[in-house]
Amino acid sequence: MAQTTKLTYQPNVLPADTLTGDKVVNHQKEDLGKIEHLMIDLANGRIAYAVLSFGGFLGMGDKLFAIPWSALKVDTVEKQFILNVDKEVLKSAPGFDKDHWPNMADLNWANGVFKFYNTKPYWD
C-alpha cells in the first residue's frame, strides 16, 4: 500500500506592526531604508504599498516612497525586505515627505508608481 503525505498550508500571517521598521536592501545588499508604514487597500483586503523611508540623517530629511507590496521580496533569514532597484535609481523615484502625502486613491498616481517599479498593478 502506497503511503501518501498530506501537504499542510501554513499561512504567513503577522501583525503589521512587526514589519514596520524592517530594513529594505537591494540585491547588492545596499541599505535602501526602512519600512515606516503599510498601506492597506480596504476594498480588496490586501497590502497595497509599503512606505519606505530613505535618505536623511537620524530621521531628519527622510524622503518617503510608496513601494508596491508586490515589488518587495521577503528575506526571512535576515528579517528584511529586498527591493530590486539601484540606490541611485531610488533617489529619482516618485516620493513625498511626511507632511505632504499623495492621494493614494488617484489611479494616475498609482499607475505611475507601479510602472516605476516595473510591477503590474494588482487591480488590473
Where are these regions (language model features)?
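Peripheral interaction segments used for macromolecular assembly
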Residues: 1-124
